[in-house]
Amino acid sequence: MIIKANGTEISVLLSPEQQNDYISLTDIAKYKNPDDPRIVISNWLSSYSTIDFLAAWETLYNPNFNRMEFHTVRNETGRLVLSAKQWIERMNAIGITSHAGRYGGTYAHADIAFEFASWISPEFKL
């Protein structure tokens, strides 16, 4: 399924097994950087406020969230740099998915995608 927001086409994965739709962060990121949206997503994931939000979401909805690994990453000294794949694998996260290949990309639960969209641009979220 495709939705349009602020003139940008955004893919939505309909996920019957998870009972939630996942919205393409890659497509949203193209609004800011059409050539390399992965950089935009990585920059967002490299913010402490972002990973705190994601951890709160995962704590609410994911009984298998790796809180110990989250605290390890959160308390590491130096600059925080995480890719979507690293976040998913290290935290056992379910709120974000990442798929390689032609029809791949990074997708997130609507709660997370809207948070990302508001980081891109407040108007984009609205």
Task: Tell what function each PLM region has.
Residues M1-L126:
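An anion-engaging/catalytic patch
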